[in-house]
Regions:
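Transition-metal
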Residues: 1-177, 239-276, 281, 308
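Ligand-binding loop in jelly-roll beta-barrel domains
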Residues: 120-125, 160-163, 212-231, 340, ...
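Short, basic/aromatic beta-hairpin or loop at an interaction surface
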Residues: 176-189, 322-326
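Loop-centered beta-sheet repeat module
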Residues: 185-243
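Short acidic-glycine-tyrosine-enriched beta hairpin
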Residues: 196-208, 217, 335-361
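Non-heme Fe(II)/2-oxoglutarate
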Residues: 219-250, 323, 344-349, 353-357
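Functionally critical, mid-to-C-terminal surface segments that flank or help form catalytic/ligand
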Residues: 258-324
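Short beta-strand segments in beta-sandwich/barrel cores
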Residues: 316, 332-337
Length: 379
């Protein structure tokens, strides 16, 4: 990274509230044109790589794993004037973890911000897939090279056009075994999806997806929070009319049957899975103020791996948190500690700033809406 004094000055100048540049990431599924990159669904397609750009990663310290790799893809960078150069959030945390993350977190998590937040913009449902569990990733490095965590994740469905198929499949019907699942994969999507229940993506609500459980996200624009991992196995072999390569379907595995050893059939067939995983925002009484209100959209009781709040400010709102967090301004205009903020802005709010009173103010004609996303608990 170099020039530690320079970056120390940046932290001091911003008082630990670090503005980040938007980070867009390629994927094999078609974008819906709702990230501001194109007005036409699929308009980001690159014929050379056969990839689209349907994801924005927020305050990310995780590198994306894609065919035709780009070094550093997925890593968030500070929003700085060109003469000041550039630095990734990951590198800054590595150098100044105690200040930015707090002493306890920096020590427990080796200067890492252990969460990954995304905005997903699918023009069509993302293919049926699952993510491995922590214990499987740790026990089988021969299959999960380069990965340190499994992936639990959760979604919050944003107030935006939902697309053509706002339904998500989650889990498997009772009695489905590996043999039946493999046969359905061979027959294609229609047969495969008959084996999985589904739910409507309701704007303003969310869902939790346990690691190891297959799912097929629908076309609603959503905020996703997850463990800091890009591990996955696909259960479909075609997307957007194109045949996917074995490397895309089961990266790290010699074949799909081997990859299916890590699917959690027991949890996937829980008859109460859909209801148990539904997330309805919970008002936070202790932070309610005249000028604003917060809700848990990913409550800390859900999992120790992450949590998140929705904040709506109509006047002035004083915020104090126990931990550093990622901040996304979703709607409206306002100020944060007196400095202008607007929809689309993204910040890393360090432990230094988060644990002291910091002030949101709505200055526009509509409420200021933001999301606060928190990492894995350190203990």
């Amino acid at each position: 990274m170099g020039q530690p004094k320079k970056w120390e000055h940046v932290i001091e100048r911003t008082k630990g509230i670090l503005k980040l540049r938007p980070t867009y990431v390629r994927r094999f599924y078609k974008d819906g044109g709702r990230l501001g990159l194109t007005k036409t669904p699929g308009g980001t397609f690159d014929p050379r790589t056969k990839l689209f750009v349907p994801e924005r990663w927020i305050a990310s310290c995780v590198e994306a794993h894609n065919p035709h790799p780009i070094k550093g893809e997925g890593l968030s960078k500070l929003h700085l004037p060109a003469p000041e150069g550039e630095v990734t959030l990951r590198d800054l945390l590595s150098e100044f973890g105690t200040v930015l993350l707090g002493e306890k977190r920096a020590k427990a998590h080796n200067n890492e911000f252990r969460v990954l937040v995304k905005i997903l913009d699918p023009a069509e449902p993302i293919v049926f897939h699952f993510h491995a569990r922590d214990e499987d990733v740790w026990a089988h490095p021969e299959f999960f090279a380069g990965h340190r965590f499994g992936k639990e994740e959760a979604y919050f469905f944003l107030d935006a056009p939902k697309g053509t198929c706002p339904y998500t499949h989650l889990g498997l019907m009772p009695g489905v075994d590996e043999k039946e699942l493999l046969a359905a994969i061979e027959k294609g999507r229609d047969r495969l999806l008959e084996l999985s229940p589904y739910y409507l993506q309701r704007s303003g609500e969310g869902y939790f997806t346990p690691a190891g459980v297959p799912h097929r996200p629908g076309t609603a624009l959503c905020l996703e929070i997850q463990q800091p991992s890009d591990v996955y196995t696909l259960l479909e072999t075609r997307a957007d009319g194109r045949t996917l390569s074995p490397r895309q379907v089961h990266p790290g595995f010699p074949d799909l049957p081997t990859a299916l050893r890590f699917l959690d059939f027991h949890t996937a067939q829980d008859p109460d899975l859909l209801e148990r995983c539904r997330l309805v925002p919970q008002p936070i009484a202790e932070t309610k103020q005249k000028g604003g209100q917060e809700w848990w959209i990913f409550p800390p009781t859900l999992t120790p791996k992450f949590s998140g709040k929705r904040l709506v400010v109509t006047g002035a709102f004083e915020s104090v948190e126990e931990d550093a967090y990622a901040l996304l301004i979703w709607r409206g205009r306002g100020k944060l500690n007196g400095k202008p903020i607007k929809a689309g802005d993204e910040f890393f709010v360090s432990h230094l700033a988060a644990t002291q009173p910091h002030y949101f103010e709505c200055t526009g004609s509509e409420p200021l809406e933001a999301f606060k996303l928190f990492p894995q608990r350190p203990f």
